[in-house]
Amino acid sequence: MVLMIVSGRSGSGKSVALRALEDMGFYCVDNLPVVLLPDLARTLADREISAAVSIDVRNMPESPEIFEQAMSNLPDAFSPQLLFLDADRNTLIRRYSDTRRLHPLSNKNLSLESAIDKESDLLEPLRSRADLIVDTSEMSVHELAEMLRTRLLGKRERELTMVFESFGFKHGIPIDADYVFDVRFLPNPHWDPKLRPMTGLDKPVAAFLDRHTEVHNFIYQTRSYLELWLPMLETNNRSYLTVAIGCTGGKHRSVYIAEQLADYFRSRGKNVQSRHRTLEKRKP
């Protein structure tokens, strides 16, 4: 397991890096005192989960020996790595000007320029020990996150999870949906007394819908639309794409079509989840 220690000058992108690591499955803690690193690692060792901790000038130990002692007390299960982020002086000044945030050392009656220089001196023990130093001066937020994924996971983009969810319009549109498709115009199994108590997961309902050309056309055109834009969505620094399929009650048509789309993209090697809001509400 990895214990990733993220440090660097304020404004260099530590918060961005920590969020990217969290998206990669790391257990993340912001500004943990160095002396508590071994305790955190021992707590997480049983859970077999990698961790990432940010350290900035506010929680730097008084001497380098304290940091070295904390590193030596880590459980053997953890492999510590130190990532140090930096940016040139003018870039840091511009970022502080843009965000209008206070520098952590600004309460010491220092100008912003002096605070940045003082911070460099205080962080030098960590910088000199870093396994990887990244200059973020010319990087966007997305580029920094992408670079970390490439270095740590060996692939450029994070894996997008496609979520296909069915719902009933009479219960309201899901607020987490990226795309909403209305299938109330398709033939409705509800009007067949034998099919009414069933759901879109049952074979007789599936057979009923499968007999209609318009159902096939809708599924084909919807998946073609998603396939067209999926490459761009996968490189858009997002974790989930939620596609909501709605019919009147959320029981028959929307369930069947959500499952058909989920099966199609799952067969193409995509990371897919499916859920059915109305059916989940009916569970005891």
UniProtKB/Swiss-Prot annotation:
Keyword Ion transport set for record: no
Keywords linked to the UniProt accession: ATP-binding, GTP-binding, Nucleotide-binding, RNA-binding
Binding residues annotated for ATP, in chain numbering: G8, R9, S10, G11, S12, G13, K14, S15
One Pfam family hit: PapZ_C
Top-level division of the source organism's lineage: Bacteria
Annotated positions binding GTP: D56, V57, R58, N59
GO molecular function, one term: ATP binding
Region entry RNA-binding, spans: 266-284
Family: Belongs to the RapZ-like family. RapZ subfamily.
Subunit structure: Homotrimer.
Role this protein plays: Modulates the synthesis of GlmS, by affecting the processing and stability of the regulatory small RNA GlmZ. When glucosamine-6-phosphate (GlcN6P) concentrations are high in the cell, RapZ binds GlmZ and targets it to cleavage by RNase E. Consequently, GlmZ is inactivated and unable to activate GlmS synthesis. Under low GlcN6P concentrations, RapZ is sequestered and inactivated by an other regulatory small RNA, GlmY, preventing GlmZ degradation and leading to synthesis of GlmS.
Record's protein name: RNase adapter protein RapZ
UniProt source species: Shigella dysenteriae serotype 1 (strain Sd197)
Gene label: rapZ
